[in-house]
Amino acid sequence: MRELSVKCRQNGLVFSVDNYVKDGIKNAAKSVSSDKLIAAVPFYTRLWLETPKTDAELASEEGTEAANYKNKVSSTALGMDEAQQVVQDAGAQTEWDDTTKQNYAQWETEDGTYKIWLEDTKSLEEKLKLIKSDNLAGVAEWKLGWENSDVWDMILQYVN
């Protein structure tokens, strides 16, 4: 799964529209007709924390792929409303990233640098537009209960 890859741990995304949704649909459609294909969308976001590696950690990783990254990265999964609250509590401002089609925020604390690409109704709508334009059979969501109250009316606008 993408979120477990080293690249994702550096980039912080769960499922961006630009490549993972478009490419996922395109690749799946090579094996399954669109009228039988269901695309999944996330109702969660990951809050990423980057902390600088110590000199000892960098030395121990020398010669490995991990040595290419100067920060340790950890993450926590958050539901849509909880993620919005974390951003608000941090006093951070979100801005729309047109490449990933997600709202993004970043802030610093004594713990390190926090980064979050929000899954919200706006980012979800971008994914649903692709699902509808590719005439897919439907949409699946993960994880039920982590969505905010606005998503279901929007989903009904895009899914048969």
Question: Language-model segments: what does each one mean?
Answer:
Residues N19-K22, F43-W48, S123, G145-N148:
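Solvent-exposed loop/turn segments at secondary-structure junctions
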Residues M1-D23, K30, Y158:
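Chitinase-like catalytic core of GlcNAc-active glycosidases
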